[in-house]
């Protein structure tokens, strides 16, 4: 739900009152308005007793009382404490970066190559991440390596990203299993309730070790289903273009990006799937993931804006009363 926000005043939410009973004070300005109308009617009748001629009266004389009543309404809303959505950093969440280091990541369709661009974007993601989040890193090709266990010291991940190097094959399923194991170890050490966790998987395509993604032991789909069962969604980022090439044994080999398997991994695990063909798009994908998992949205008190507006309106009413209804000494 959209919330109006005024410069110098702040947001003015009008839903989810924490103290709705205070809205009964809204009857006070209504009663005062009724009393004012009765007094004005009696005043007109009293004037007509002495003269039948119309008495010239400025309609502006009603403005101070109207603004005063408006200020009471605004202050009543402030007392009822409306709520608005607040983004609160997650302090115990665990995020595992899982980055493909296979030979296809040598492709230079993204400068300087897919892996280096992935390192740059992941480093920026780590540096901007909410400080209380535990961040870890798994690098993988044919074999996954837990390079950084989950830790709130994000610099450890930034340093490890600089050391990623190419290797043969792509064992995406094993890499996910490794990340899940690291998350489980953090949950055991962290207390009674497991922290919210997420895997961020970056690759340019599907796994080839094993060749069957549904392999019951190491298949990537098997790993994705386990992640779903453990409540760990996988956000996948498919990175690269259809025109990617690498040089092997003096020959150009096409390594086009493949999105189908990555999308299925995200779907099976309950996560989101992203695609990026350049560094800018990759950074946007990371930013979207950070907004999704780095914070949680909770209702918070939103009466400050109404209080400021009510006080400002009361001051305006006072100024109008002095300006319009002033009496000069004779």
Curated annotation (Swiss-Prot):
The chain crosses the membrane at residues 21-41, 63-83, 304-324. InterPro entries: UPF0353 (IPR022933), UPF0353/GerABKA_families (IPR050768), VWF_A (IPR002035), vWFA_dom_sf (IPR036465). Keywords: Cell membrane, Membrane, Transmembrane, Transmembrane helix. PROSITE patterns: VWFA (PS50234). This is UPF0353 protein MAP_3434. Belongs to the UPF0353 family. It comes from Mycolicibacterium paratuberculosis (strain ATCC BAA-968 / K-10) (Mycobacterium paratuberculosis). The keyword Membrane applies. One of its GO terms (cellular component) is plasma membrane. It is found in: Cell membrane.
